[in-house]
Amino acid sequence: MLGDLIMNFLLYLFAIAIGIITGGITSLIGASGVMVIVPVLTMFFQVSTHSAIGTSLFVDVIASLVVSYAYFKNGNIDFKSSIWIVISSIAGAQLGTQFASQIEESSLSALFGIVLIAAGIGLLIKSYKKNSNEKESPKKKIRFNKQWQQISALIVIGFGIGIISGVFGAGGGVMILLALIMILEFPLHKAIGTSTLIMTVTALSSTIGYASRGNINYELGCLLSVGAVIGGILGARYANKVNGNTLQKVVSICFMCLGVVMTIMEIVK
C-alpha cells in the first residue's frame, strides 16, 4: 500500500518534470510538446495513443497561452499577422491531412526531422554571420506597398504552413516560426511570440475535438500543465532577456537536437 503511494507520487513528480520540459520547449522554439508527452504517457502511464495526443494538446493550450502572455508583455507579438495566418492555416491543414494519408508515417517523421536539422544548421550559420552587438532589425524581407498585398501574402503563407502542418502532424508551431523567420524575416523574439499565439488557437481547436470524444486524461493533463506553466514562464523570461543572436543559437541547437532524435527514432524502428 505504502509502496503504491510512493510510486504514484514519483510518477506525478515525473509528470510535472515532463511538463516543465514541455513548457521550456514551447517558450524557446514555439513547438508543441506532443513529441515529448505522447511517448511518456503511453509508456509510463499506460494511456492510449488517442488519449495521449488529446492530453498533449490540452497541455499545449495551457503552455502556449502562458508563453504568449509573457511575450505579449514584452511587445513581441504581431496580432495582425496572427489573425490571417490562423484563418488560412486551418484551411490548409485540412488539405494537408489528405496528403498525409497517402504518405507512410515513418517517412513523414524522418523527413520532418531532416527539415529541422537543416533549419537548425541554417539558423546557426546565420547567427555567426551577424555582429553580436547588432540589434535585431524590424524590417522584413518582403515589402508591401498596399495592405491587401501583405494580407494576401500572409494568407498564402498561412495556407502553405497549414498544408505542411497537416502533412507532418504536430509541427504547426515550428513551421510557423520557420516561415516568420525565413520568409518574412521577423525579429526572432517577435517570431516566437507570434507563432506561440497562433499555436494556442490551433491547439485549442484540436483539443475541443479530442475532448468531445473523451480522449483527454484531465488528471495527468493538469499535472503536466503545472510543470508546463513553470517551464514556460522560466523559458520565456530567459528568451525575452537575451539578445536575438544568442536566442537564435539556442533555437538552432534545439531544432537540430529535435531533428536528430526524430530521425534516429524512425531509423531504429
What spans do the regions from the language model cover?
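Juxtamembrane transmembrane-helix boundary motif
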Residues: M1-G24, V38, M43-F44, A70-I163, ...
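Hydrophobic, membrane-facing alpha-helical anchors
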Residues: I6-L11, F58-V66, N145-K146, A170-A179
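Short helix-coil transition sites and intra-membrane helix breaks within transmembrane domains
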Residues: I25-V34, S165-G172
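Interfacial segments of multi-pass membrane proteins
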Residues: I37-S51, S165, M175-K190
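Conserved glycine-rich helix-kink/hinge and helix-boundary motifs of the Major Facilitator Superfamily
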Residues: G54, S82, I192-G193, S252
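Short hydrophobic/aromatic, small-residue-rich stretches within specific transmembrane helices
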Residues: S56-D60, S195-M199, L220-S225
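Membrane-embedded alpha-helical segments of transport systems
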Residues: F58-V66, A91-G92, F99, I198-S205
